[in-house]
Regions:
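Core catalytic lobe of class I
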Residues: 1-182, 186-191
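Short, conserved SAM-binding/catalytic segment
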Residues: 194-198
Length: 198
């Protein structure tokens, strides 16, 4: 299968993403990371460095491009792609007085052929509340992360998060006896992650 990391589990920036159309799209998610990167280059590199499974939380605007990338791999017999949905049991009412509340977050899941999957006949919809004591504005529910890590890796495996934020994915990986590597560009969040992982 190749690659250095058993599981890549990440939450990419929902800010500005340089899309394959060579245009810059402002995805406008308040308080999200603002970082410009080339999504196609990112996907190619993540695919290359991951041995088994890739899970990418993303904005709805990024979903189709990410899903298409992995669908092409699936067509070539290199793995299986699915859309995962985190259904929030307590969505934030922010700006929801006169519109529907956004009660879900999307992720794309891709398992390389022969990769680890410790669940059986599991649904792609996960129901968990939003965390209220977050150290990063887009931090995911730790029990959701725990379920994903247990389903898609084994103890002693390496979990990689190239968009580490405040280190929640790494923290849960550590709690589940996985090794972890996290990368974060913003010094403020790097320091938070370093402290919580000590």
């Amino acid at each position: 299968m190749g690659g250095q990391f058993d599981l890549t589990l990440t939450d990419i920036p929902y800010g500005e993403v340089n899309r394959s159309s060579n245009g810059l799209r402002n995805l406008d998610k308040e308080d999200a990371d603002i970082l410009t990167f080339n999504l196609q280059d990112f996907l190619k590199k993540i695919y290359e460095v991951t041995k088994s499974t890739i899970i990418i939380f993303c904005g709805k605007e990024q979903m189709s491009e990410i899903h298409k990338f992995f669908s092409e791999k699936q067509k070539k017999g290199k793995g299986t792609v699915r859309q995962l949905v985190w259904k929030k049991t307590n969505p934030s009412p922010m700006n929801g007085q006169n519109i529907y509340l956004s009660g879900i977050e999307n992720a794309v899941w891709f398992k390389k052929r022969g990769g680890t999957f410790n669940a059986h006949c599991k649904n792609t919809v996960f129901e968990y509340p939003c965390g209220r004591n977050k150290l990063h504005p887009t931090e995911k529910n730790h029990e959701l992360l725990r379920e994903l890590i247990r389903d898609n890796s084994n103890e002693g495996d390496i979990v990689f998060d190239p968009c580490c934020g405040s280190g929640a994915h790494c923290l849960v990986a550590k709690e589940e006896n996985r090794n972890y590597i996290g990368v974060e560009l913003k010094n403020q969040y790097y320091e938070i992650a370093k402290e919580r992982l000590q």
